[in-house]
Amino acid sequence: MRDIGSQPAAGVRSMKVRDRALEIIRERISRGDPLYDFTGLASRPKVDAASDELRTYLSEALILPEIRELCREHFDAPEYEVLVAPRTTAAVIATILALEPRSVLHVLPEDGEAHPCVEEGCRLAGAEYEEVEESEIPDLDGFDLVVVTGCDVRWNVVSEDTLREVASAEAVTLLDDASGDRVRRLHGQKPGPRYGFDLVVTSCDKLMDGPRAGVLIGRDDLVEGVRRVCEGYGWTVDGPTLAAVKRAFEEFELSSLEARLKELERVYERLKDELDVERTGAGLVFHGVEREVEIGLGLLRRYGIMTITALGYERVDRTLRFNLLTEDAERFGYDRFVEVVKGELS
């Protein structure tokens, strides 16, 4: 079990890197230079609603019921309740606080990297935290809550066998499907509730044109408990956010991602013999790269390529990686991307 602690020095360095990246973005915008999202996070949320629908309380009355039905259809879970949170991380932490578990198991895809929110939620709740890859799953009877990461920060995808095994546990089960809801489906898997998970959460900005909000869908009694925690901490969303969430689910089409997945395969084939590159569920991860942060900042400065390496928050995995399923990756051009990466990393 890993020790839970803070790393203030690393945090300061992360903020300085991110501040520099944001400065470069401002400079490019002021010159009229383009920017391209290779993070999978910089979506283009759309707000389309009458002014009254965007007002506090009115938006909950008018828009939230539509979101509920859209999400039930999207997740193929007609009996589940729906909650919109300001962030997926807020929904995850609120779930842990609501359940007050004594022990939590966090299951990652093989070679996966964990988002820190599950561990942080356990620290706040005073729960024991254990983190394993899917090949190392212990006896699930010893845990009150089991969390599975459907697709990790490098877009490694969990197996269906693991989803079925965990969903059948006696413990409460949560599928953290931030980008996994889209990435897993691209690789032939089903929506989280179809495996029997009690709760599933996804991010509306990851490979969807929605706001940076999280949607939690699950058993009525559990979602109601999470809702109370979110409201108690002020983790609620406003009318424009609800309108953008609604539009994101209305307009989502898997077919556009399927076409880009074919381009990802083609790009990988062109790079694999020249660079130490790994193809994952949604992009490419480059290994053995020195000065990753400097390269990430350089790509942003010269080409407008936005990466997590340059723009990530504290405790983020800064391994150089590119999500090639974004609309911006297509707009940048896959052939151009190959030449740029070869020039920067060869």
Curated annotation (Swiss-Prot):
Give the sites modified to N6-(pyridoxal phosphate)lysine.
Answer: 206
Q: Which domain of life is it from?
A: Archaea
- Organism of origin: Methanopyrus kandleri (strain AV19 / DSM 6324 / JCM 9639 / NBRC 100938)
Q: Does the keyword Signal apply?
A: no
Cofactor dependence is on: pyridoxal 5'-phosphate
Disulfide feature: none
Q: Name one Pfam family in it.
A: UPF0425_C
Tell me the keywords, alphabetical order: Pyridoxal phosphate
Which InterPro entries does this chain map to? PyrdxlP-dep_transferase_arc, PyrdxlP-dep_Trfase, PyrdxlP-dep_Trfase_major, UPF0425_MJ0158-like_C
Which molecular function terms from Gene Ontology are attached?
L-seryl-tRNA(Sec) selenium transferase activity
Source taxonomy lineage? Archaea, Methanobacteriati, Methanobacteriota, Methanomada group, Methanopyri
Protein name, per record: UPF0425 pyridoxal phosphate-dependent protein MK0620
